[in-house]
C-alpha cells in the first residue's frame, strides 16, 4: 500500500498546496485526481507566492513525476498560462508532468454556459467560480465530453465545432450576452501547449510504477464539505472531493490505499453561498479574514470566516477514513484571548451532533478555550508551541480520535512543524 491521499476536510482553502509541497520529498509521484481550475493551491517558496490551479503541487521538485489524472477537467487556456508562469522552461516541465488521455476538457462553451446558468438563478445563485467546471462535468456524465487524448486526432477541430454548435444551441435559451472569439483563440493556443506534454493512459502508468514500489501521493482539490454527494448540496462542486474519488480519478484499487491525510484550518472559511454554521458576521470574523488573508486564490472573493466546526470535521474524517490530521493557520489565532470551538448543533430546540440532511438553520453549540498571545511563525518544534495552542490541538485530537502530526505556523514551506 504505497499510495497515500491528501485532501481537505472543510470547504476548501485549507492549505493543501503548501502541505503537498512540504511532504513531496517522501514521494516519487504527485497526482491530481479531481477538480479543475476552480482549485487554487497556494504555496510560498522563499517568500515567493505561487498559485496552482491544475498542476499538482509537486511540480517545484524537479525529481518528482506529476500527473493530471482522468478525474480532472482541464481548461487548456488556464493550463498554458500556468505553465508559462511557473518559472522552469516548458521543455523542463514536460519531463515532470504527464496528462491522462481520459481527462475531460473544459471548452469555451462550458465557461459561457456556467456564467449563463448562474446569471439565470438570480438570488438563488450557488456561488460558482464561473470556470466552466459544472458544465464540463455535465457533458462528461452525459457522455458528451471531449477528452485530452482526442486533441491528438486529425479531426479534432471538427469534433470541437460539433460541441460548440451544441453549446451555442443551449445558450439560445438564456437572455445572456457573451463573446467567445477572443477566449476561443487563447483556448486553441492552450491546446498547442497541451500537445507538448505526454498524454498517456495514466491508469496503466500509475499501476505499473506503484507496482514497482514507487510512492504516490494523490492530491485532492476543494474540500470534503464541497463533495457532490456528501457536501452541503446544492452548494457544492461537481466532483467527488473525498478519498474515494482518488480511486475513480486515477484508476487505482481501494486496496492500494495506505494513509489518508486530512487537512483542516484551525478555524473555518468558506467561499460562495451555502450553509456555514459557525460563520462570524462581526469584528472577529473580519479579524480572521484580514489576519489570515482570506481571499480566494482563484476568484479573489473574500472568504466567509468562522470558528472551527468539530461535527463537520468528524463527519469528514468518517467519510474519508482519515488516519492523520494536518492543521494549518494556527498562527492566525495568535492574539485571541479566547477561542471558540463548535462541538454540536442546536436545531428546533434540540441538540444534535450530526450534520442535518437539509440546509436548515442550525445554531452552533460552543466550547470556549483559552487563547495565546505568542507569535509562533519561528517555532519549529511542537513542544515549544504555546501551552494553550498545544491544549487546543489536544482538544481536537480527543474529540476526533485522530492525531495531529503536522502543524503549519506560516505560509512558507519552511514554516511547518512535523510532529513525531
Regions found by a protein language model. Give the residues of each.
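Non-transmembrane, aqueous-exposed alpha-helical and coiled segments at domain scale
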Residues: 1-420
Amino acid at each position: 500500500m504505497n499510495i497515500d491521499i491528501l485532501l481537505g476536510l472543510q470547504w476548501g482553502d485549507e492549505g493543501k498546496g503548501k502541505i503537498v509541497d512540504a511532504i513531496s520529498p517522501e514521494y516519487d509521484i504527485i497526482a491530481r485526481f479531481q477538480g479543475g481550475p476552480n482549485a487554487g493551491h497556494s504555496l510560498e517558496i522563499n517568500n515567493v507566492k505561487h498559485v496552482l490551479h491544475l498542476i499538482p503541487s509537486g511540480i517545484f521538485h524537479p525529481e518528482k513525476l506529476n500527473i493530471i489524472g482522468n478525474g480532472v477537467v482541464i481548461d487548456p487556456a488556464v493550463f498554458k498560462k500556468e505553465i508559462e508562469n511557473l518559472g522552469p522552461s516548458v521543455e523542463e516541465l514536460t519531463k515532470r508532468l504527464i496528462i491522462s488521455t481520459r481527462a475531460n476538457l473544459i471548452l469555451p462553451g462550458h465557461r459561457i454556459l456556467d456564467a449563463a446558468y448562474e446569471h439565470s438563478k438570480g438570488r438563488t445563485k450557488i456561488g460558482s467560480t464561473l470556470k466552466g467546471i459544472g458544465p464540463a462535468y455535465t457533458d462528461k456524465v452525459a457522455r458528451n465530453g471531449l477528452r485530452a487524448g482526442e486533441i491528438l486526432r486529425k479531426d479534432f477541430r471538427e469534433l470541437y465545432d460539433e460541441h460548440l454548435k451544441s453549446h451555442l444551441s443551449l445558450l439560445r435559451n438564456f437572455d445572456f450576452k457573451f463573446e467567445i472569439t477572443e477566449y476561443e483563440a487563447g483556448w486553441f493556443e492552450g491546446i498547442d501547449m497541451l500537445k507538448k506534454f505526454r498524454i498517456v493512459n495514466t491508469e496503466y502508468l500509475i499501476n505499473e510504477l506503484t507496482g514497482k514500489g514507487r510512492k504516490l501521493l494523490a492530491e485532492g482539490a476543494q474540500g470534503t464539505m464541497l463533495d457532490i454527494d456528501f457536501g452541503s448540496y446544492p452548494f457544492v462542486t461537481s466532483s467527488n472531493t473525498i478519498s474515494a474519488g482518488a480511486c475513480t480519478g486515477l484508476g487505482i484499487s481501494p486496496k492500494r490505499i495506505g494513509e489518508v491525510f486530512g487537512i483542516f484550518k484551525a478555524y473555518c472559511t468558506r467561499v460562495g453561498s451555502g450553509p456555514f454554521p459557525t460563520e462570524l458576521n462581526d469584528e472577529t470574523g473580519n479579524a480572521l479574514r484580514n489576519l489570515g488573508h482570506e481571499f480566494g486564490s482563484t476568484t479573489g472573493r473574500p472568504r466567509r470566516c468562522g470558528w472551527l466546526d468539530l461535527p463537520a470535521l468528524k463527519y469528514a474524517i468518517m467519510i474519508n477514513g482519515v488516519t492523520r490530521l494536518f492543521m494549518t493557520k494556527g498562527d492566525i489565532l495568535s492574539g485571541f484571548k479566547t477561542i471558540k470551538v463548535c462541538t454540536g448543533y442546536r436545531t428546533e430546540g434540540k441538540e444534535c451532533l450530526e450534520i442535518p440532511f437539509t440546509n436548515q438553520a442550525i445554531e452552533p453549540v460552543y466550547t470556549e478555550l483559552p487563547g495565546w498571545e505568542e507569535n509562533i511563525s519561528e517555532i519549529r518544534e511542537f513542544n515549544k508551541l504555546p501551552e494553550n495552542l498545544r491544549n487546543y490541538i489536544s482538544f481536537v485530537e480527543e474529540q476526533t480520535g485522530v492525531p495531529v502530526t503536522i502543524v503549519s505556523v506560516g505560509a512558507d514551506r519552511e514554516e511547518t512543524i512535523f510532529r513525531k
